[in-house]
Amino acid sequence: MRIFIDTANVEEIKAANDLGIIAGVTTNPSLIAREGRNFREIVEEIAAIVDGPISAEVVSTTAPEMVAEGVELAAIHPNIVIKIPMIAEGLKAVKELSARGIKTNVTLVFSANQALLAALAGATYVSPFVGRLDDISHDGLQVIADIVPIFAQYGFKTQIIAASIRHPLHVLEAARLGADIATVPFKVLMQMLKHPLTDTGLARFLADWEKVKNK
């Protein structure tokens, strides 16, 4: 499994990238708006930091507009992946963008049926939203469990990005189920890094060393 970071905050991206563990970035209009900065500038900054796929989402809702917006976004940097919502017009846009050699990430996926249609349209990635399904008392991870064998059965090259990650267990289970990627908020990434026994063990090692280092 690969780990992407789900944020538009450049400082968070720098910090995560310095750890040497992230392979890409996902953003969305809400994350961009939270930064209160020019969209293109943020995407260009991210592309200068991370050498991997960077998902940037369209805000149009008709296929021709999504395609035009996607072409414009893709021109910013070769690593840009166009995020397209899982709607009928979105599938049309995915088909056209894919035909032009532009990578796509179909977002707001909440069922295996939606993921199947996105793969058939030629999506590079699909992003099932685990946490949002959990929020309405559905099993978000079950959707990943449903998608993985379908894609394997028919040899789809579309990669599965576990999205809407709320806690480290989501990442662990998505990895266990066979998702290709988990896109993780910075806060959850830091939670994955830490364990109280690691801190306790390190403190003990250092304390023991202090007792003998000058002997």
Curated annotation (Swiss-Prot):
Annotated GO CC locations:
cytoplasm
EC number(s) on record?
Answer: 2.2.1.2
The terms under GO molecular function for this entry are:
aldehyde-lyase activity; transaldolase activity
Q: Where in the cell is it found?
A: Cytoplasm
Pfam families documented for this protein: TAL_FSA
The entry's active site is 83
Keywords, in A-Z order: Cytoplasm, Pentose shunt, Schiff base, Transferase
Q: Which pathway, per its entry?
A: Carbohydrate degradation; pentose phosphate pathway; D-glyceraldehyde 3-phosphate and beta-D-fructose 6-phosphate from D-ribose 5-phosphate and D-xylulose 5-phosphate (non-oxidative stage): step 2/3
> GO annotations under biological process?
carbohydrate metabolic process; pentose-phosphate shunt
Source superkingdom: Bacteria
Q: Which reaction does it catalyse?
A: D-sedoheptulose 7-phosphate + D-glyceraldehyde 3-phosphate = D-erythrose 4-phosphate + beta-D-fructose 6-phosphate
Gene3D superfamilies from the UniProt entry: Aldolase class I
Question: Which family, according to UniProt?
Answer: Belongs to the transaldolase family. Type 3B subfamily.
> Mind telling me what this protein is named?
Probable transaldolase
> What's the encoding gene here?
tal
